[in-house]
Amino acid sequence: MKTKPASVRELAVYPIRTVAQLTGVDARRIRSWETQHGLLRPARTQGGHRLFSQRDVDTILRIKRLVDEEGVQLQGVRLLLAAEEAGESFEDRVMAFPPRG
């Protein structure tokens, strides 16, 4: 049985230091979003180092925008990402959350 080749966007190639530079999000915050909030699932090297795909980078930028610009709490972000994975409209869901005041 042939496996479908990963698209370029799904190849895990960026170490966390590079992702932090690309996104402007501190590496500690990225780790927290993964380990404490379950928002990210980066690949790991055999040595346990995180490797992120372009899709992961896009997700981090999306999380950053939602939290920092839209005022969505991380629990809401988790629900929005789950909705997107289920095929629901991500942007429509954002509008359903009132901004924090």
Regions found by a protein language model. Name each.
Residues 2-21, 35, 41-46, 54-101:
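Arg/Lys-rich, alpha-helical DNA-contact motif
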Residues 26-29, 73:
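Short coil turns linking two alpha-helices in DNA-binding domains
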